């Protein structure tokens, strides 16, 4: 594939082979991430004389298929972006007038969003590399739109699929790959290129490639700022100073003087005289013009010449001619002639470039002078006291005359410029005529020399060997010239071949992508038509049911009502089946059998429970679609990741608020991994690379006391999740590996029931090693010591802290529980131990985990209180302990609105200081330790008394008693 050197394939193991691979290669590191497409390019920007190429740092974002550009690699916010998904590319062919051996142009065009952006690479090879890489990225992104399911809840952003077990679901394609022939043709048309030093992340450490116009842009910008500052002094109401003047420096010593009041009076008098003979002096402009352009012999050195002179001195410092006035010419003699010729050629090119820049600057000066003339003249005619008392028609006539004068002046200047250009063209043509005459003379001499050689050969035939032509003969010149022309034509031919290959590949790709887009549109139309038909069918059935409900009910005759209800129930309990995926668009289902996390949405056994679960799933779907219509959260995440394209993620209030609102499904793997790495960086720095593989190898070689309990709990972890439902599931093997590795890392805990559920949730979005470090984060960083030990000391302490917080934040509900003697910590104990796994619906569970992995265990207290506050009124209506306790066992599954729950957790419960939780933990820790010590003493006394009791005897059988 083109540009394969810049991309690395993602590795990833799955199933049982992953464990064996990790065991066989304990030193193997994690899979390498694909290399980013980034580097320096020059972008054509600006307007007018300031238009030119500016060096920019470009970074490709595969999530949105955007090509962002920055001023430098260190910038956090991009200057803009190009949408590559709907872009097409082109570049110009070789220049036929170019000299043979010269470097062809390396600029190309990106046509996107109705605009054309011109980019320039340092050389032709890098231009080809960028074009093929951008083509490849566009191809992968657009084809990935076909590789995901149409349900938006199961469709991560193309190019940014999550990792972990949920990533495996994205490989279930609705369509087979439709572009096999197009892919084969693309490979044939591809041109192998190798990235240079200015591509890739290593290019950020190198200086940006410069271009000769950089100093001119800077000088023009500075010059424009000075002009703007000088113009700001032209405000009415200020006193006139005759010595004040505005000077424009060009290559000629022109000076722009402000008009004095005397000049204005003279101009008004002259205009009044011209009113009598308006046609008399139509072409005369000098007498009435309020500005004086004159030579200023006393002016010092001009700033523009200083800039150009310093630029020449910097670039011609190696010129030997600048050293030779002292009489020692040894330096220039020692230099080779080729080097001297190259220097002279480069200086000539710089001189031509400077001449072009000088002409553009002169044009800018002319436009600015004309603008200043017009503005100042209008100012004096509108605000000057000299115009007081002058009739209105006279002033209008003066304005008309002034406009005529300005127009004639502009026309005169334009004609002058045209005259200069024509004169320059005449001079160029004369020089070309001279060159052609020289070539004609040389050809005549060559023909004459050939005639002489032919005559000599004919005269001396048979008398001896033919005379050889000297190498310096004029006949060699046409041969060399023909050879150069042949080389140039060969270069052009090769360039046209490459361009033809590229354009053919571009046309092929655009045609294939267009066909894919048309097919997606047809499928979506079919899906929406089917949904509309199903909606009409359901509405019809409900209208029939409502009509039947109006009729009197007969106890003996069931009537058609029961049949309609039975049919509606049967239709409602249907779920999406994966046996016939080709009919997914023909018969769409609103609720699938599994959600995006792999949890079963509808149970298999109880029909009544199935109906309740189906209603809950439909409510969740409705909430999700409603939230999706408000795209503010998704847009905020996209904007945040756009600002981090050029830098690493960092903790900030903005990121905290985004995570609290919930991480989108397509970004959760990336953000979770970043959170885990941030909390475990100190552990990883103190361990050898491949720490997880080493522990896993040890667990496979040696027997661990915890391994038996781990095996017993594997299938009991998340039986309602398809990734852990059977022994052959991929998640079971990964879960075993992580738990065994952790049991060897932390022998004090080994294994505790509850750790398996923590790892199972982490594995849904993380790979094995990252899930291992996630467990380390929870057990060794977030939770207090002895949280998962045999005594569960830390867990018991947190329940007492939570009881204190309940009495403070929810006093009515706490008093209600105390009144009916309901110990709600029996319910909340499991919430804290496994961080709400199997306690809330999956959408809310993962939003809780988002904040938990970023902020720590304080989030558990927030959400536990928020769950009770969410249903506070319903709980207060219950008036007996049995109904309260029964409601507490399932009420969390009835909470579906994650946005409301998050608002309660991080809004209504504030303030929520972490220091308060730490102080109460320390207070209750001593009390619980004292109670456990007393219980242990009582237990030891009981065992001691039982062992030393004289009444203790050996048990005998009934037969022995009979005998």
From Swiss-Prot:
GO terms for cellular component: cytoplasm; cytosol; early endosome; plasma membrane. The modification Phosphoserine is found at residues 155, 317, 473, 957. It holds the Pfam family RabGAP-TBC. SMART domains: PH, TBC. Transmembrane segments: none annotated. Residues 1-30, 272-348 are annotated as: Disordered. InterPro entries: PH-like_dom_sf, PH_domain, Rab-GAP-TBC_dom, Rab-GAP_TBC_sf, Rab_GAP_TBC_domain. GTPase-activating protein that plays a role in the early steps of endocytosis. This is TBC1 domain family member 2B. The lineage of its organism: Eukaryota, Metazoa, Chordata, Craniata, Vertebrata.
